[in-house]
């Protein structure tokens, strides 16, 4: 940007701008956007006055070629660009000779024909907003305001534009050229966004009584009174160097601001160790459903009835056996637990009337799996406060894990389309206002793109499981209730379908606090052989429970059916959020909406229809080692949704920390890409804060590896 300014503007203007910035303690090399803005403003002021004269008769005339004999007086006195002392001297002399009221702020020009001061504004925003800010700041009827924008708009006091059309057109053309030149060098966006509003001087108002006493009590250390603190704040130079600001604030701080260059950032260090394992509350891409179409059986909609009906669609059950044991668990107990579920479901069918819920017998295998009587006994603090060596358990540091390829596959799968629709197009009443019409149009387009997405299936599955588990936890606190894992969808032909993924058995659930844990055992059907990626299934015991006939291109093939069993736990607060997973749809819709808004503001009309219907256009989806991945607008919707859903499924403190800390580094890198010349201090500390969140969580590790791809491509 600095080079551009020096090439684009007359050397005299550049010199004046540098002088003005130095007077305010600003550096043209650092605040390059401000440098460009000051030069532009100076040039507009000079162009405003160029060629305008007043002849002997006091008439205003335009003379383009200089006639040395003519007795002409410049129509405008230029005040902008002079140093402050000189500028006020000129103003004082004008006011003394003409009797015009003296302005409070330094204006830019004086018009000898109209006998008024002029404030010139050049804005990258809306002219009327800038006009109001200027008017608010000067609060003077006498000073005439004239605002130009880079888009050719202008606004002046009482629509009196002072100059003829041709002179104003010259100024507008020049501003447009500057904008084009900046845009062609990739400088315009950053320049446009860097404009700040006019600072208005606040009127002082006195604080008295109680508020005054509170103010005096709440001062920072070393300040005796509010006045003394105010004086300090007012004297605080807002645009000095950061180092100076910091040392003004505290004697202990000494930060060196280092420039952040393309070569500065290094990739994030991902942990070494065994590959990370699956930790979601239910299976994702590996889940298998037993389904019934057009359910119309008696008691349809009662989970237990639906589950039994789904189980009856499968005929390939066989004697279960363990194919992948759980390293630390008592595996025969998992096997016995599954056999118990089968036996108790059989018992239900032999009863006259099927009950609505099923509580499992409290067998030794279930007590073990659900951690019954495993919690250490709670002792009243009064009884043990005299124990001399009372201490908290030592807990081990979590073991570091490396990124495994399965989590990227999980994410890719979540972005794919399934052959069923998982959400209904909500029928909402007629739109009354135009904005409602646009909103429902966007919602309908978005719903069409994501209703068949696998991430949407995960949402509905998550909502169902968490709702059922929270209900059972409150309604049957002491019981080991059997909870079917069910979802509902519609086929391509619009037929209703009920799916069973497996079962959950809930442990004792006296949940007083939000964070109290309820244990559960999950048993889920799958066709995935766990021996292919044993590290993914570290927390599971996997049984082979049947053979399933699958239709393929070469006819029917038989595949072993597996049951993934594990002990897990959740809490009231986690279940509450799980029940609200539909919010992910809203979050991703809002992200898409901001993309549409950006398009619409450029084109100055609503672009919703074009945005979704222009199938040829591709959009950036994300970074991969290959570069920036692009795809259709539908793919963008589904990717954003999948990210939001995974943030919910894999929510963790590691993710919270990583998201917050890596965002800071992301903003610095984006500032560098926008040529804003960012500076940093303690970059090492920021890396430390990010990397302490990279421990063993698969979703966080995947995000960190995406972040590294982004760094590589962003800094090329």
From Swiss-Prot:
<keyword id="KW-1035">Host cytoplasm</keyword>
<feature type="binding site">
    <location>
        <position position="41"/>
    </location>
    <ligand>
        <name>Mn(2+) 1</name>
    </ligand>
</feature>
<feature type="short sequence motif" description="Nuclear localization signal 1 (NLS1)">
    <location>
        <begin position="124"/>
        <end position="139"/>
    </location>
</feature>
<feature type="binding site">
    <location>
        <position position="108"/>
    </location>
    <ligand>
        <name>Mn(2+) 1</name>
    </ligand>
</feature>
<keyword id="KW-0378">Hydrolase</keyword>
<dbReference type="GO" id="GO:0039657">
    <property type="term" value="P:symbiont-mediated suppression of host gene expression"/>
</dbReference>
<feature type="short sequence motif" description="Nuclear localization signal 2 (NLS2)">
    <location>
        <begin position="184"/>
        <end position="247"/>
    </location>
</feature>
<keyword id="KW-1104">Inhibition of host RNA polymerase II by virus</keyword>
<dbReference type="GO" id="GO:0039523">
    <property type="term" value="P:symbiont-mediated suppression of host mRNA transcription via inhibition of RNA polymerase II activity"/>
</dbReference>
<keyword id="KW-0479">Metal-binding</keyword>
<keyword id="KW-0945">Host-virus interaction</keyword>
<feature type="binding site">
    <location>
        <position position="119"/>
    </location>
    <ligand>
        <name>Mn(2+) 1</name>
    </ligand>
</feature>
<comment type="subunit">
    <text>Influenza RNA polymerase is composed of three subunits: PB1, PB2 and PA. Interacts (via C-terminus) with PB1 (via N-terminus).</text>
</comment>
<feature type="binding site">
    <location>
        <position position="80"/>
    </location>
    <ligand>
        <name>Mn(2+) 2</name>
    </ligand>
</feature>
<keyword id="KW-0255">Endonuclease</keyword>
<feature type="binding site">
    <location>
        <position position="120"/>
    </location>
    <ligand>
        <name>Mn(2+) 1</name>
    </ligand>
</feature>
<dbReference type="InterPro" id="IPR037534">
    <property type="entry name" value="INFV_PA"/>
</dbReference>
<dbReference type="GO" id="GO:0004519">
    <property type="term" value="F:endonuclease activity"/>
</dbReference>
<keyword id="KW-1048">Host nucleus</keyword>
<keyword id="KW-1190">Host gene expression shutoff by virus</keyword>
<keyword id="KW-1157">Cap snatching</keyword>
<keyword id="KW-1191">Eukaryotic host transcription shutoff by virus</keyword>
<comment type="similarity">
    <text>Belongs to the influenza viruses PA family.</text>
</comment>
<feature type="binding site">
    <location>
        <position position="108"/>
    </location>
    <ligand>
        <name>Mn(2+) 2</name>
    </ligand>
</feature>
<keyword id="KW-0597">Phosphoprotein</keyword>
<dbReference type="GO" id="GO:0075523">
    <property type="term" value="P:viral translational frameshifting"/>
</dbReference>
<keyword id="KW-0464">Manganese</keyword>
<keyword id="KW-1262">Eukaryotic host gene expression shutoff by virus</keyword>
<comment type="function">
    <text>Plays an essential role in viral RNA transcription and replication by forming the heterotrimeric polymerase complex together with PB1 and PB2 subunits. The complex transcribes viral mRNAs by using a unique mechanism called cap-snatching. It consists in the hijacking and cleavage of host capped pre-mRNAs. These short capped RNAs are then used as primers for viral mRNAs. The PB2 subunit is responsible for the binding of the 5' cap of cellular pre-mRNAs which are subsequently cleaved after 10-13 nucleotides by the PA subunit that carries the endonuclease activity.</text>
</comment>
<dbReference type="GO" id="GO:0075526">
    <property type="term" value="P:cap snatching"/>
</dbReference>
<dbReference type="GO" id="GO:0046872">
    <property type="term" value="F:metal ion binding"/>
</dbReference>
<dbReference type="GO" id="GO:0030430">
    <property type="term" value="C:host cell cytoplasm"/>
</dbReference>
<keyword id="KW-0540">Nuclease</keyword>
<dbReference type="InterPro" id="IPR001009">
    <property type="entry name" value="PA/PA-X"/>
</dbReference>
<dbReference type="Pfam" id="PF00603">
    <property type="entry name" value="Flu_PA"/>
</dbReference>
<dbReference type="GO" id="GO:0006351">
    <property type="term" value="P:DNA-templated transcription"/>
</dbReference>
<dbReference type="GO" id="GO:0003723">
    <property type="term" value="F:RNA binding"/>
</dbReference>
<dbReference type="GO" id="GO:0042025">
    <property type="term" value="C:host cell nucleus"/>
</dbReference>
<protein>
    <recommendedName>
        <fullName>Polymerase acidic protein</fullName>
        <ecNumber>3.1.-.-</ecNumber>
    </recommendedName>
</protein>
<dbReference type="GO" id="GO:0039694">
    <property type="term" value="P:viral RNA genome replication"/>
</dbReference>
<dbReference type="InterPro" id="IPR038372">
    <property type="entry name" value="PA/PA-X_sf"/>
</dbReference>
